[in-house]
From Swiss-Prot:
<dbReference type="GO" id="GO:0006887">
    <property type="term" value="P:exocytosis"/>
</dbReference>
<feature type="transmembrane region" description="Helical">
    <location>
        <begin position="40"/>
        <end position="60"/>
    </location>
</feature>
<feature type="transmembrane region" description="Helical">
    <location>
        <begin position="110"/>
        <end position="130"/>
    </location>
</feature>
<feature type="topological domain" description="Cytoplasmic">
    <location>
        <begin position="181"/>
        <end position="197"/>
    </location>
</feature>
<feature type="transmembrane region" description="Helical">
    <location>
        <begin position="79"/>
        <end position="99"/>
    </location>
</feature>
<dbReference type="InterPro" id="IPR009787">
    <property type="entry name" value="Jagunal"/>
</dbReference>
<keyword id="KW-0812">Transmembrane</keyword>
<comment type="function">
    <text>Required for endoplasmic reticulum organization and proper vesicular traffic during vitellogenesis. Required for oocyte and bristle growth.</text>
</comment>
<feature type="topological domain" description="Lumenal">
    <location>
        <begin position="61"/>
        <end position="78"/>
    </location>
</feature>
<keyword id="KW-0896">Oogenesis</keyword>
<keyword id="KW-0256">Endoplasmic reticulum</keyword>
<feature type="topological domain" description="Cytoplasmic">
    <location>
        <begin position="1"/>
        <end position="39"/>
    </location>
</feature>
<dbReference type="GO" id="GO:0007029">
    <property type="term" value="P:endoplasmic reticulum organization"/>
</dbReference>
<keyword id="KW-1133">Transmembrane helix</keyword>
<dbReference type="GO" id="GO:0001555">
    <property type="term" value="P:oocyte growth"/>
</dbReference>
<keyword id="KW-0472">Membrane</keyword>
<comment type="similarity">
    <text>Belongs to the jagunal family.</text>
</comment>
Amino acid sequence: MATRGGPMVAGTDGNDFEFRQRVAGTYQISLLNKSRLKYCIFFHALLFFVMLAKLTSDILDRLDIFVLEIEELEVPSPLWWEYVWAGSLLTSFLGLSAARGNKVREMQKYMIAILVFAILPLLYCFAYYFSDVWEFATMDKSVELDETDIFIWRGYPYGVFWYAFCFVGFQVHGFTLYFAYNLVKVWKARTATRKFQ
């Protein structure tokens, strides 16, 4: 240990620690993508609560619980994809577990689960409401919404609400897959380097 003002090792000015105290690039990339993946999972949870608010009416009906304020909203009955998408939040535990332990196989399973339980239901929603949204987007200004075949809820086209949800959902799940893929790539490279050594 050197003391301040004490003898200095010949050939160095004391700044050589800058070259020795670097974190490997793969660890930095892994840490950055883990952090971003956790943010994506957080936004997935926020979207889940939006979906849960929509599903509350149907869930309470199935449990035979009557709440006047919720019934007055006249929320449309949910489709199957809404429940499948809501269940996709459970896959987040798999992703968090994989990120915590740097487990390549579990992260790959998480990516497949997000694709099947989150992105495919959103694609179905996108296709299901396409005709309503297209008709709304291309209709004349002089035509009233009530005169069309567009499904209306609270004075607005119902499909437009779902398109907004899908837009945010595609972004969240797209970034989730991107960060998970980056983690898998880095972890595989790191294990390949260990095997090579």
